[in-house]
């Protein structure tokens, strides 16, 4: 074997090798001898098939296995010459040449190595952080909302007319072209008027009705309605209002605190106000971080933390971004790229900057997570996906299986780790008094959230 290895920088190396055809043919014989005892061909007993016939019948598999063996040997020797271990190899080598000549094979490949990352400029990267402290007005607004949310619905007198925030029990049936349609009928159906549980025009038609009253009204389904067979159609609805219930107002006092903080001993309005203030602070913090500071922190990390990146990983990320773009493109756009190799190359190349930044930030986050011992358990990933399923009306098991099938669970975990690392860095840069608010909130993290 004739091998040359050149280290380009701390994260990249290039190898070129020449291997004799004779070397490869010897591998063919060894592999054929290895599989021969398991081969069964009509007319021969198992294990008694002539080696020449095994090599002919399984030529493609034998050649592939031999080439893979040869590649692994080349890589092993290249790493040895570089003085690095296999665990320091990143991703798969990118073979730029694999040619068979008359007497030998010529191989050239780019190798990605684990980058060396120095985290001495992290403090310079973290932007100044100042979260808005909730004022009395905001606290009072949330207390009023809590009083409303926890209020029970009670029966009303027969003369009451339906108004927003009332709970109605109705029977209804819809017709299109004088015929009932699927999903257009229900009995003893409950809805909160004004909650947008039903179409806005449907709820508006119920305003002012009294218990026992019946009503007919036309309704046009939106052109973008989720049920395609109803989108844009004109319907006639017949509704009977069975019952109206109104919220029984709750006073903002210690009794409300005991209801909201049911898991707390000796809950008081003072304690509830403290919890509300803390919850509002956390919401303000999350909004500031997600809408502004995390992105600023990422930009600073990208700019100030400098190290060599493995080019093979950048190329793989470009491939991923290019494939994702193809999935979201119109058929005409995909066809245009298929017909022009030059256009396809240009499109793929347009993702280089994004791919480079993505790879770089991933390496930085991984290094920070290890240094600060920040991780995410698999169960937390599943909980996140369960929540996503609930919010989107999907089956949790099906959603998790979909992520698993598409090898996306690792990406979800990495995104969660990134979020925790960025939050950790920003939290450390909070003013002292705001860090104290956070510390005060942590013992109550598992208790009832307010609002």
From Swiss-Prot:
GO MF term set: peptidyl-prolyl cis-trans isomerase activity; protein folding chaperone; ribosome binding
UniProt signal peptide: none
Residue ranges of every copy of the PPIase FKBP-type domain listed in the record: 165-250
Keyword Cell division: yes
GO terms, biological process: 'de novo' cotranslational protein folding; cell division; chaperone-mediated protein folding; protein transport; protein unfolding
Any Pfam family the entry gives: FKBP_C
Alphabetically ordered keywords of this record: Cell cycle, Cell division, Chaperone, Cytoplasm, Isomerase, Rotamase
Ribosomal protein is among the record's keywords: no
Subcellular location: Cytoplasm
Major subcellular site: cytoplasm
GO CC annotations, alphabetized: cytoplasm
EC numbers: 5.2.1.8
Catalysed reaction equations from the record: [protein]-peptidylproline (omega=180) = [protein]-peptidylproline (omega=0)
NCBIfam families given in the database record: tig
Free-text comment about domains: Consists of 3 domains; the N-terminus binds the ribosome, the middle domain has PPIase activity, while the C-terminus has intrinsic chaperone activity on its own.
Function: Involved in protein export. Acts as a chaperone by maintaining the newly synthesized protein in an open conformation. Functions as a peptidyl-prolyl cis-trans isomerase.
Membership in a protein family: Belongs to the FKBP-type PPIase family. Tig subfamily.
Protein name stated in the entry: Trigger factor
Species for this entry: Helicobacter pylori (strain Shi470)
Recorded name of the encoding gene: tig
């Amino acid at each position: 074997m004739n091998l040359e290895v050149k280290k380009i920088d701390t994260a990249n190396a290039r190898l070129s090798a020449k291997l004799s055809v004779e070397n490869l043919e010897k591998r063919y014989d060894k592999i054929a001898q290895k599989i021969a005892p398991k081969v069964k061909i009509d007319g021969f007993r198992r294990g008694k098939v002539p080696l020449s016939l095994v090599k002919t019948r399984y030529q493609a598999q034998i050649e592939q296995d031999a080439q893979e063996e040869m590649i692994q040997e080349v890589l092993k020797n290249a790493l040895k010459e570089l003085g690095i271990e296999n665990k320091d190899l990143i991703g798969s080598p990118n073979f730029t040449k694999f040619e068979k000549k008359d007497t030998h094979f010529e191989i050239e490949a780019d190798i990605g190595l684990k980058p060396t990352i120095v985290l001495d400029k992290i403090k310079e990267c973290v932007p100044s952080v100042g979260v808005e402290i909730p004022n009395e007005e905001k606290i009072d607004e949330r207390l009023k909302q809590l009083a409303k949310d926890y209020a029970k619905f009670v029966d009303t007198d027969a003369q009451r007319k339906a108004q927003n925030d009332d709970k109605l029990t109705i029977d209804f049936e819809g017709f299109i072209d004088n015929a009932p349609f699927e999903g257009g009928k229900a009995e003893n159906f409950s809805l909160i008027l004004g909650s947008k549980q039903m179409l806005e025009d449907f709820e508006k038609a119920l305003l002012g009705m009294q218990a026992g009253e019946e009503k007919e009204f036309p309704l046009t389904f939106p052109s973008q309605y989720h049920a395609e067979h109803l989108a844009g159609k004109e319907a006639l609805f017949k509704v009977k209002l069975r019952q109206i219930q109104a919220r029984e107002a709750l006073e903002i006092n210690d009794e409300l605190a005991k209801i909201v903080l049911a898991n707390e001993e000796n809950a008081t309005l003072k304690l509830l106000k403290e919890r509300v203030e803390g919850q509002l602070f956390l919401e303000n913090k999350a909004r500031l971080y997600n809408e502004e500071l995390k992105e600023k922190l990422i930009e600073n990390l990208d700019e100030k933390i400098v190290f060599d990146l493995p080019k093979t990983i950048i190329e793989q990320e470009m491939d991923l971004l290019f494939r994702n773009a193809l999935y979201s493109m119109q058929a005409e756009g995909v066809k245009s790229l298929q017909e022009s190799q030059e256009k396809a190359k240009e499109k793929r190349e347009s993702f280089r900057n994004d791919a480079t930044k993505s790879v770089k930030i991933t390496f930085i986050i991984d290094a920070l997570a290890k240094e600060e011992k920040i991780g995410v358990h698999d169960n937390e990933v599943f909980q996140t996906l369960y929540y996503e399923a609930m919010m989107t009306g999907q089956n949790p098991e099906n959603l998790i299986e979909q992520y698993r099938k598409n090898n996306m669970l690792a990406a979800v975990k990495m995104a969660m780790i990134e979020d925790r690392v960025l939050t950790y860095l920003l939290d450390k840069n909070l003013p002292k008094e705001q860090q104290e608010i956070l510390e005060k909130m942590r013992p109550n993290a598992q208790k009832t959230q307010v609002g």
